[in-house]
Amino acid sequence: MESAWSSRGTSLGSSDPQLQRFMEAEVQKQRVQLLIHHMTELCWEKCMDKPGPRLDGRAELCLVNCVERFIDTSQFILNRLEQTQKARPLFSERLSD
């Protein structure tokens, strides 16, 4: 069913640029939500030994560090991808010369 939706979405998007941008934005939102869910699960498993009525200092610090490392890593990856994409057109141009 997903492939049927994807093929319909692709054909609609190619005929309507506004619809295509909307669909891309929705897919991006879904990816962000999945990433947040995964990060929450990962940090929870790493930092929470036994849930209680309040976070103790150690668990709070662990959660903060976990989220900060996740953000740092994500930013690093995005920067690296951006550098790679900037370098790719130069490489493609050299091949066509």
From Swiss-Prot:
Q: Which key words are in the record?
A: Chaperone, Disulfide bond, Membrane, Metal-binding, Mitochondrion, Mitochondrion inner membrane, Protein transport, Translocation, Transport, Zinc
Which GO terms are recorded in the biological process aspect for this UniProt protein?
protein transport
Chief subcellular location = mitochondrion
Q: Where does it reside?
A: Mitochondrion inner membrane
**Stretches that traverse the bilayer:** none
- Its membrane topology, per UniProt? Peripheral membrane protein
**Pfam families listed in its UniProt record:** zf-Tim10_DDP (PF02953)
Covalent S-S links between cysteines: C43-C66, C47-C62
- Domain description from the entry? The twin CX3C motif contains 4 conserved Cys residues that form 2 disulfide bonds in the mitochondrial intermembrane space. However, during the transit of Timm8ab from cytoplasm into mitochondrion, the Cys residues probably coordinate zinc, thereby preventing folding and allowing its transfer across mitochondrial outer membrane.
Gene Ontology cellular component?
mitochondrial inner membrane; mitochondrion
Species name? Mus musculus (Mouse)
Q: What is the lineage of its organism?
A: Eukaryota, Metazoa, Chordata, Craniata, Vertebrata
Protein name, entry field:
Putative mitochondrial import inner membrane translocase subunit Tim8 A-B
Signal peptide bounds: none
Its gene is Timm8a2
